[in-house]
From Swiss-Prot:
Gene this protein is translated from: secE
Record organism: Aquifex aeolicus (strain VF5)
Cytoplasmic topological domain residue ranges: 1-27
Protein name: Protein translocase subunit SecE
Membrane topology: Single-pass membrane protein
Cell inner membrane found in the keyword field: yes
Length: 65
């Protein structure tokens, strides 16, 4: 039980030393991550659509032989 108390005291002391980011910085970083994720998602969607069309075209050529 004593070790648990020491551990929790150490955790509390460490949390006091943490330099937390400002709200403004957190909001800006969050917006950046959302925009980047959306951009990557759109890029992958276009890539998937393109490959789907190419494969469908190739398979349609094979079917006409």
């Amino acid at each position: 039980m004593e070790k648990l108390k020491e551990f929790l005291k150490g955790v509390r002391d460490e949390l006091k030393r943490v330099v937390w980011p400002s709200r403004e910085l957190v909001v800006k970083a969050t917006i950046s991550v959302i925009i980047f994720s959306l951009a990557i998602g759109v890029y992958l969607w276009i890539l998937d659509l393109t490959f789907t069309k190419i494969i469908s075209f190739i398979l349609s050529l094979r079917g006409s032989l």
